[in-house]
Amino acid sequence: VTIRRATARDAPDAADVWLRSFAAALPSVVRPRSDDDVRNYFREVVVPLRETWVADAESGIVGVMVLHDGELSQLYLAPDWRGRGLGDRFVALAKERNPGGLGLWAFQVNGPAQRFYERHGFVAVTYTDGSGNEEREPDVRYEWRP
């Protein structure tokens, strides 16, 4: 599996990974945007305007990570690719690209993500009731400092 910068032609597959991963990892979280809105967002914003990376396997795109302004804003893997070390590789790359530190948000219902980030040295610094995010889902702010 190769991790590389996303190109415009990766946007549809990266969006599909996001959609499948979100549905599998966060079944109780209500998304405020339709599948088509998510695909458009990846095509018009995420890939062209953010530092977007994809994990490219023989079968196609199996992971996506988005960095922006010192934030690890998105990290999603195809459900059948969890537990294979891709997330570890993405986080190592994120730290390499942001050696001064990183921040991120995770939903409180996503215990596996919280454990994953804590294992990688991220520390929970703020818990919210979700009123500040589109999903209105309680979340937690994590920070990593070298």
PLM regions and their residue ranges:
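A short beta-loop-alpha structural element at the N-terminal edge
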Residues: 2-16
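Conserved active-site tyrosine of GNAT-family acetyltransferases
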Residues: 117, 122
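Conserved GNAT-fold acetyl-CoA-binding loop/helix
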Residues: 15-44
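Conserved beta-strand in the GNAT
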Residues: 54, 60-76
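A short helix-loop-beta-strand connector motif used in the catalytic cores of GNAT acetyltransferases and
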Residues: 43-54, 71
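Conserved acetyl-CoA pyrophosphate-binding loop and the N-cap/start of the following alpha-helix
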Residues: 80-81, 85-93
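A short, internal acetyl-CoA/4′-phosphopantetheine-binding micro-motif in the GNAT/acyltransferase core
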Residues: 71-82, 106-107
